[in-house]
Amino acid sequence: MSSAEITIIKRDGKRKGFSVEKIKNAIRKAFLSVGAFATEEDLVNILSHVRITEGMHVEEIQNQVEIGLMAEQYFAVAKSFMLYRQRHSEDREVRDHLDFLIQYCQAENAATGSKYDANANIEKKNLATLIGELPKKNFIRLNRRILTDRLKKMYGKELSDKYIRLLKNHHIYKNDETSLANYCASITMYPWLLEGTKPIGGNSIGPTNLKSFCGGFINLVFMVSSMLSGACATPEFLMYMNHFIGKEYGKDYWKNPDFQADNSIKKRTIDKIITDCFEQIVYSINQPTGARNFQAVFWNISYYDKHYFESIFGEFRFPDGSAPDWDGLSWLQKRFMKWFNAERLKTPLTFPVETMALLTENNEVKDKEWGDFTAEMYSEGHSFFTYMSDNADSLASCCRLRNEIQDNGFSYTLGAGGVSTGSKSVLTINLNRCIQYAVKNGRDYMTYLAEVIDLVHKVQLAYDENLKSLQAQGMLPLFDAGFINIGRQYLTVGINGLVEAAEFLGIEINDNPQYVEFVQNTLGLIEEYNKKYRTKTTLFNCEMIPAENVGVKHAKWDREDGYAVPRDCYNSYFYIVEDKSLNIIDKMRLHGRKYIEHLTGGSALHLNLEEHLSKAQYAQLLRVAAQEGCNYFTFNIPNTICNKCGHISKHYLRECPECHSTDIDYLTRIIGYMKRVSNFSMARQEEAARRFYHRDR
């Protein structure tokens, strides 16, 4: 192949025909810059050290020119050539930043403008959000250097280079490379009760009354979230709040909530005092914060039926020796849900993301009271997740590690798994590209997947070592203070493109033996490696990641490289989100025990409905979920927000019911959390428009 026929890859990723004259001119300029002249013989000798191959990057060619200059002992010329490259590299970086600044300012919204990790959890783009975006490219470089240095020490340069190659070829994706922080955590707040925020860099003591609990809790969530790149879950939140209400108004306060307990001019009842506390906490935490690039913290809470409560908190004692009171907590959980549901008619509140934990027995919700209340809240238009299990200790055992030889562990990286657990790092496998790559190259795709999965585990172990190194140097106070137990944190193997990979293989995406076999074999292989690399202090899980950002990226990158891509955003479910042929029960079955058996890190089913169902219908769907083993789900009905008068309706409408304006927006779940559709990136807005919503007929 002649040099004229070879194509090389430029810095912007585009291919261009190779020109030897451009290389010669660059060398001539380098000679002239030091007062010398390059003869044709000089050029031939220098270029004899350069080997050009198809698809080579321009940077590699320039590296070889440097080597050629040094080999021929033109040291001054080589130095000049290197400095020239460095200056131009700096100029390009500044130019890239300027181009990004202009594009970001002109973008439809912050999510569309973000180049690296678009998310809808930003209401409006502004200077603060721009400042947060600009350094992300450098954070990616730094994170890759830190990780590859560790990989070289642990496994050698070959594996380190392979990791970068798989990253750049989009076979794998490192989530949250733009942050140095570990991913998410479901914290225990017990250290806060004992020592306040002092152990993590604050200056406050622990809460002593209801007011200090509310203010201190807000500060705690902000502080913890600033040290995480993902979600912060506080599963003890309402239990602690119930404790402080009881200390102030008596353990049985909930029996007489209308009692006037405020002697101020407001004359507030106990109920009003409590809902004022709700308001203070929820509205404060929903505000954007500078430590999170001017977005709200991603805050999650849990509700429990009596059986889950007794399993997780049965032996819990507050510092004063008292046990948590279930009766008061049960009332407070219901009161918070009712209040939060009503409050969302006033303003589109995103957080907390709520998860209801229910125990099942004989394919029924065991706690009838809480099963009925769950159905009631869904029927009243409230939007929350439900986690169901036929073993109350299964959630407590694996997430709190009471039983360290447990084969399987459940922990969802949105932070809904339990107390003092979470995910340290997420590394995602693009199943669609990996499988198509193997098939196109005549390889058994399961064998190739095994290679990728093995590498992913080694990379995660390298990340874990770096995290331990940071902790040893005092950089992770959340671990040192006991808010998070590093031994209970998971290294998460994410998956994306599973449905698209199955489609490529000619498998129908519905409940059929071929699809079951494909899912079980693929996810079972990951679980096999999770168990292989697991130790008493190092845990792995597998999650079908929400993929708000990377689902769009994978589809774009794979299509550009000639792979079969059936849609513009890869699914985060076991079914095709726009498929109209599947009913609600079909989707629950596709997220049931046959499919999620090996998915220990979560796969939240979002059941998109056009309208709310009745309490009886939701109760029946809870039974169906229990029968099918569909353990994690929510119902998603878009709420209508009028841009003209501000009215919010829990219904999916085409015009405002108050002023009849058609200038409306919708509040729906982009992935795990609810935001205005107008806050979604443009790609995700297009995906949202393709979703199929079931109608109650």
What feature does the model see in each segment?
Residues M1-A110, N485, A689-Y693:
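Charged, amphipathic alpha-helical regulatory modules used
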Residues I6, S48-I52, G314, E500-I507, ...:
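Short, hydrophobic beta-strand segments
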Residues V77, F81-Y84, C630-P638, M682-R697:
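Long, highly charged low-complexity segments enriched in Glu/Asp and Lys/Arg with interspersed Ser/Thr
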Residues L98-G487, E508, N512-Y666:
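Conserved catalytic cores of very large enzyme subunits
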Residues K272-T275, F504, A689-F692:
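Metallocofactor- and cofactor-centric catalytic cores in central/energy metabolism, strongly enriched
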